Design a protein with these regions (language model features):
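Edge/loop elements at the starts and ends of beta-strands within beta-rich repeat scaffolds
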Residues: 38-45, 114-116, 141, 159
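Short loop/turn motifs at secondary-structure junctions and domain boundaries
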Residues: 56-57, 101, 127-130
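Short Gly/Thr-rich strand-loop-strand
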Residues: 105-120
Length: 179
């Protein structure tokens, strides 16, 4: 169930959910991450996702997502599905997420991702039951997220880890899609 829910939500929302707080929303590092995530809402992208849960730490799940225009394609357990996607709504949801929780953002360093120059940011959030620690690599050329890692905590215990790698070149709809 948790994998299905995570795969059905665009990954940029995950980053925004973890960095939601008005107190630091104007911080330069937080703004850089937010701008990258907002830009990603409208960009064609192919994402490869790895998810590890506390319940099955040695059995990572591998999924893919492709966003093209008004369609989000999701692959889980080898099967592709298509769902409607609204970039404007996704951007609005991202902006609204900035009003929740408590977070801090830090620019860590310049670091290449698959040969592409990028800036690495660390985003930490706190919630009533735990929080998360994320790293987001933003391309210096395009301003889009290239890689994201998130560790979600609940009462000090790791509940979930996921990594997302994003590719913006030659993005095409998958063959064999069920609707």
């Amino acid at each position: 169930m948790i994998a299905r829910r995570l795969v059905s939500v665009p990954l940029f929302a995950t980053v925004l959910a973890i960095m939601a707080a008005p107190g630091r929303a104007d911080d330069a590092a937080c703004q850089a991450v937010l701008q990258a995530v907002l830009k990603q809402t409208a960009a064609p992208v192919h994402q490869k996702v790895t998810i590890e849960t506390a319940a099955a730490p040695d059995k990572p799940m591998h999924n893919e997502m492709i966003r093209l225009g008004d369609t989000l394609y999701m692959q889980a357990r080898g099967q592709w599905m298509a769902r409607p996607y609204d970039a404007a709504k996704a951007a609005d949801d991202a902006r609204q997420a900035m009003t929740k929780g408590e977070h801090s953002c830090t620019r860590v360093r310049s670091e290449a991702v698959d040969g592409q120059p990028a800036e690495l940011y660390r985003v930490q959030s706190k919630t009533a039951t735990g929080g998360s620690d994320s790293q987001v690599w933003v391309s210096t050329a395009s301003g889009l997220p290239l890689r994201q890692t998130v560790t979600m905590l609940e009462q000090g215990t790791v509940k979930l880890k996921h990594e997302v790698r994003s590719d913006y070149t030659n993005v095409r709809a998958p063959a064999d899609v069920s609707r």
